[in-house]
Amino acid sequence: MEKISKQHVQLPNNLININPITPKDLVIYLAIRRFLNGKTGECYPSLATISKKAGAAINTVRKSIDTLEKTGYLIITKRGRQHYYSFPKDKTFEPFSFDFLDKEDLTFSEKAYLIASQQFMFKEKGEGKITYSNKELAEKINMSEKTISRINQSLVKKDYLTIEKSHKLNPITGIKINEKFYHLNQLEQAIVFTLTNHEERIQENTNDIEALKKRIAELEALAFKK
């Protein structure tokens, strides 16, 4: 049986909404953050390492690092000749598995597109569904409609995406909406959502138990006063 990796990197949900961040910057962000030391809260991968992990040119890495730093989503501390990277805390995030990030049959642009689009997917049973038109999605993820169309065609050929005509109509154009189904199992992303949802449910149960304990203590204190 194939071993499923549980390792993943977290991407802030609102990052793609910050101007002038583009999808390619998200790939670089994740390529850096995957090296984060949980104890120190820092990491120090070289530009060459980031370039290799992201599948991007050194100049692209430099530009993205500059953009991420200027927007406040990447903190750079210089110690001698070494650059240390850290990240501000964020409450909501999208998880991306190491297996997905390391997929060799996906191009840099395809990964950038999928990473930027993931937060707009309705995720269920190993599938991620998007009902936005290419034009609507282009506006949300800061990527051209033409590029999205080209990448979608490539993902369909690679069996990572299925596009189906919906019975629903676009309220403005009256044209049937195309529903896009991204195959998260094949993209090595489904297991991450399963684990993340499980952890969230555990945390919710823990919070409920703590709230119940607090309420019982309050009632006991009230009864004692009487």
Stretch-by-stretch model annotation:
Residues M1-K226:
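Electropositive, intrinsically flexible nucleic-acid-contacting patches
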